[in-house]
A protein has these predicted regions:
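Hydrophobic faces of well-ordered beta-strands that scaffold small-molecule active sites
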Residues: 6-11, 39-41, 82-86, 111-115, ...
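Conserved, mostly hydrophobic/aromatic
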Residues: 10, 31, 71, 102, ...
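H/E-rich (His + Asp/Glu) clusters that bind or coordinate divalent metals
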Residues: 169, 176-273
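Distinct, well-ordered alpha-helical segments
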Residues: 94-104, 123-132, 151-165, 180-188, ...
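Active-site gating/metal-coordination segments in enzymes
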Residues: 54-144, 194-195
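An N-terminally biased module of ancient metal coordination in phosphate/nucleic-acid-related enzymes
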Residues: 1-69
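Active-site environment of divalent metal-dependent phosphoester hydrolases
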Residues: 14-16, 46-49, 90-94, 120, ...
């Protein structure tokens, strides 16, 4: 792992109200320990509904400006290594002048809009999300979106958004979490600007995606440090993580060129870094 470049496109801070403990200090230690070259980080404090799709009480919510400010401050401490996906709140907020200015003034580190159709229970093609897609188009940002777990988060809705906005790169995070990924795999081939990531996706599914569509459709992502400092190696129970195969031996399965695309180059291209 010491000689490879890794761009983890799915890293988090925050999330206390969802039961997570993901601090900037933990992420900093993690990327040093595992020699991660670059990361794209989003702040889970922007969640609007809980794991049961119940609204998080307003007194416990963090507005999207404060959430983004925390992520920006973290990225500024790690120049050219930490980039930001701005996790937005379409269920209860809108784009204000202040929010757009914050995006515009930090385009050197903000590289994506983060949608979470589960934790906002709002589809990417819901009218409340459209202004955020317009914002991504205006500032040439990618859109990374959770898929899976509820109807609003179905991969088909991200595909619909990709068709509507062909200028925006869309990343299907999880490829349909909790499914066999078949729907997401099929959708990958239907839009040139639609991509997948490896977060909780088995390596054989990623290999199949590469066999079906070539090496430029999948990005490495992990949800780190959701299972702790060593998410790349172990899950919360101490059993081997799904990411071990990606980091140890997967290069032999898909070839050097495809491996470099998956683990580093695709994210650099899609996020423009």
């Amino acid at each position: 792992m010491d000689n490879m470049k890794i761009f983890d496109s799915h890293v988090h801070i925050g999330g206390t109200k969802l039961g997570f403990d993901m601090t900037e200090e933990m992420v900093s230690e993690m990327i040093d320990k595992y020699n991660i070259s670059k990361i794209l980080v989003s702040n889970c404090d922007s969640a609007e509904v809980d794991h049961d799709l119940n609204p998080i009480p307003m007194e416990y919510q963090v507005n999207q400006i404060k959430s983004l400010e925390r992520a920006i401050n973290f990225a500024r401490e790690h120049k050219d290594r930490v980039y930001v996906a701005a996790w937005v709140k379409p269920l209860g907020e809108t784009i204000t002048d202040e929010f757009e200015t914050m995006i515009k003034d930090n385009l050197d580190i903000i590289k994506a809009i983060k949608l979470h159709p589960f934790h906002s229970n709002t589809s990417p093609v819901d009218e409340r999300c459209i202004p955020y897609l317009e914002l991504a188009s205006k500032y040439k940002l990618a859109v990374v979106s959770h898929t899976g777990g509820c109807e609003a988060a179905s991969p088909v809705h991200l595909y619909e958004a990709a068709v509507r906005y062909p200028d925006i790169p869309f990343v299907m995070v999880h490829m349909g979490l909790g499914t066999d990924n078949t729907q997401a795999l099929n959708l990958l081939g239907k839009a040139d600007n639609l991509y997948g990531d490896t977060t909780w996706v088995k390596a054989d599914v990623t290999k199949k995606a590469i066999e079906m569509y070539g090496g430029k459709k999948m990005l490495f992502g992990s949800d780190s440090p959701i299972d702790g400092l060593d998410t790349y190696m172990y899950n919360k129970t101490g059993d081997p993580s799904i990411y071990r195969e990606y980091m140890n031996g997967f290069e032999k399965e898909i070839g050097n060129d495809n491996y470099n695309l998956l683990m580093y180059e695709n994210s650099c291209r899609i996020f423009g870094v």
